[in-house]
Amino acid sequence: MSNYYYYYGGGRYDWLKTVEPTNFLKIGLPYQAHPLHLQHQATTPPSILEKFKRADILLNEVKAEMDPLMLQPETEKKLFQILSSIDMFKGLRKKVEFTYNAQIVTNAWLKMYELLNTMNFNNTSQAFCNCELPGGFISAINHFNYTMMHYPTFNWVASSLYPSSETDALEDHYGLYQCNPDNWLMQSPLLKKNMDYNNGDVTIASNVKNLALRATQRLTPIHLYTADGGINVGHDYNKQEELNLKLHFGQALTGLLSLSKGGNMILKHYTLNHAFTLSLICVFSHFFEELYITKPTSSRPTNSETYIVGKNRLRLFTPKEEQVLLKRLEFFNDTPLVDLSLYQNLLESVYFAVETIHLKQQIEFLNFGMKCYRHFYNKIKLLNDYLAPKKKIFQDRWRVLNKLYVLEKKHKLKLCAASQGSVA
């Protein structure tokens, strides 16, 4: 029996095991007290990266089994229906919205609430949420702060990429931007003529520096920085980490330029096998008393998503560190930021996270999804019927573990009335 999941289907489908992580996965990384030596193009002995490259190959081999199904609209549709059926949180979002008076209850909302409930941050009353629209993180923090922490106020600023074309819609599905314009740092393309125009693109070094400046001018201190950025890679999931390197570097750098001492950080990542990603984690380890790689239970186990969490920032950048990192973003290359041979103990902990989250949990869930596809291709209703009782048990358990309470009307975020619905 799997260490992660169990379910007894009975009869001809007694093999059926729901994919439900029993625990919030959290792997701690050691703080680095030695001096930080940033390099423009650090070299790394191949032996250090060998097991990470092997992990990448093993995971991609399993992902590749789904690739042929993505080529035909009919099989692609069926695959996503199957994966939706084995999503243990499907339906929970509506329950949370209506039972607890919650807002913008997306999957991002569930993940952020779970992170806040599990990580025991010292203060989250003032937050900068980057790469944020449609607003699930802000809404979850607002709900948590008022119902669990009982802060008298919640102050926030946020940013997201503003589309360059007037014909492209801003992802403001719930009206959080429209109804709270003073809380947002990015600007419409209509303001391009302004000297300090910033569209929220964190892959541009000048934007990053300017966003951090705007954030700290409007909100001081910043107790919590979050960033949930990710580029749509289409069907090319094997290159998801590589294609997001610059974006994830930019969103991390924005946070490190704006987060106050004593503050906490939550950053979205995917796999953690590329030398540049590993070096970025090494950089984080110099700034936070506690550093973790996490996988919330509400983060779908079929995907490679991870969240890096830093608790209690110990120091700010030196002018030289800021200069080197901004220059690297401006003239980006994906060589390591530091000499990885100086961080072998930390890299052992990162690899344990890779094994736990990707080589065990994700691969097992992907294999489970493919088995369900083969057995339930034309029997999706039957699959849903099998899983429905277990989903209810698990969702009820999640609500108890994460201590949900009703949000008072006076503490709700201001949203545009026409777009306050939730994602099922």
UniProtKB/Swiss-Prot annotation:
Keywords, sorted A to Z: Early protein, Methyltransferase, S-adenosyl-L-methionine, Transferase, Virion
Q: Where is the Adrift-type SAM-dependent 2'-O-MTase domain?
A: 103-315
Which residues does the entry assign to the active site, renumbered to this chain?
Answer: 268 (proton acceptor)
Q: Name one GO biological process term.
A: methylation
Where are the bilayer-spanning segments?
none
Annotated Gene Ontology cellular components are: virion component
Query: Primary place of residence?
Result: virion
Do you know what upregulates this one? Expressed in the early phase of the viral replicative cycle.
Does this entry carry the keyword Methyltransferase? yes
Quote the PROSITE patterns the UniProt record gives: SAM_MT_ADRIFT
This chain belongs to the protein called Probable methyltransferase EP424R
Species of origin: African swine fever virus (isolate Tick/South Africa/Pretoriuskop Pr4/1996) (ASFV)
